[in-house]
Amino acid sequence: MPDGADPRIESPFLRELHAYWLSRRGGRAFPRRSDFEPLSIPAVLPHLILIAVERGATTRFRVRLSGTFVDSVFRRTGTGRYLDEAPINIRHPWRLEPYHAVSTEGRIDVSRTRYVDDEDRRFDYERLLLPLAVDDDRRVDMIVGALSFAEPIVTPGVPFSARGT
């Protein structure tokens, strides 16, 4: 395992994202956004999410970039949306806690979860969230992450052969 690798990360491309993030830190706790070039990790791009931390009366998380594979799984474009407006996060606001922890504590978050959408499609994924700074080294202004989906994504009532997996 490379120096600094997190043993909790199972997905190969999440490990690749983490290794790249570590390489961009320099001597800082986390990299600046300007040091982080998503095109340098092309295998991760379809699975990537880049989220702006917007602080005001409350802290909100706006998706600045959502990878094509992530959008295809969730069946909508994530870019431009606020995480707290997603139906599942309205019903289960605790799902935003990892984003708050990353933005306030500057630590990484590795998790595995099962997602059930409004159409009762169920899928499991591993998620990695990593802090980025825009202006200084102590304040998290952006979160970069990626989702690694387990196969198959289950759609009730659709035969396995018709799922295209």
Task: Give the role of each language-model region.
Residues M1-A86, P93-T165:
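Intrinsically disordered, low-complexity terminal regulatory regions
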